């Protein structure tokens, strides 16, 4: 049997691949440490000042994403929220995300140049729930936390938090007031 490809059949095959579930989306992975991650998360040497500088140089915001093994909301974040191409592409395109374990033992160099375990850093930042996103920006010449998202909001509000931070709206208004203003006619 001879296979004869026409431009039309090739175009249809390409379209089918692009429309297939998951096409063009980043992969959700379960790491050896039992934590869900995205293949677009920053491959970090865990020096937060360097990671922040690299994010700024790339024109992106910077966030830490905290999780823990066995966390059902962390799984949901990765299998439902980041499976949504609108959410996933916005976060991937606008933020550099470093993933940390709330109980982890890897050594992290913080913004103040002190090295400590992930667990100790989570304690310093009072991160108690997972998933938690911490967003960082510059104020007074220093890197500081500018917003925090503990747990999961409904998808529209979750995405809105990233847009709020990306817009720098945290300098002028709280998240809820900003959300209300976005919905106003």
Q: Where are the model-predicted features located?
A:
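Short active-site neighborhood of thiol/selenol oxidoreductases, capturing the structured segment around
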Residues: 58-71
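Typically the conserved alpha-helix immediately C-terminal to a functionally engaged Cys/Sec
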Residues: 75-90
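Thiol-based oxidoreductase modules, predominantly thioredoxin-like and allied folds used
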Residues: 88-116
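Structural micro-motif
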Residues: 118-134
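Non-catalytic, surface beta->alpha helical segment in thiol-disulfide oxidoreductase systems
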Residues: 129, 137-170
């Amino acid at each position: 049997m001879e296979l004869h490809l026409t431009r039309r059949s090739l175009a249809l095959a390409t379209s089918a691949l692009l429309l297939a579930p998951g096409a063009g989306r980043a992969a959700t992975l379960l790491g050896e440490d039992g934590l869900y991650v995205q293949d677009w998360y920053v491959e970090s040497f865990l020096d937060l000042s360097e990671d922040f500088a690299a994010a700024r140089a790339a024109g992106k915001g910077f966030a830490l994403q905290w999780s823990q093994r066995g966390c059902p909301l962390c799984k949901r974040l990765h299998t439902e929220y980041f499976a949504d191409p609108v959410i996933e592409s916005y976060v991937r395109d606008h933020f550099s995300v470093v993933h940390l374990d709330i109980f982890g033992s890897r050594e992290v160099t913080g913004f103040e140049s002190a090295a400590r375990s992930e667990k100790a850093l989570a304690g310093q930042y009072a991160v108690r729930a997972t998933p938690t996103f911490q967003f960082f920006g510059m104020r007074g010449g220093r890197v500081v936390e500018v917003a925090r998202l503990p747990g999961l909001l409904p998808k529209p509000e979750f995405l809105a938090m990233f847009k709020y931070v990306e817009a720098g709206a945290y300098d002028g208004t709280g998240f809820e007031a900003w959300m209300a203003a976005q919905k106003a006619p």
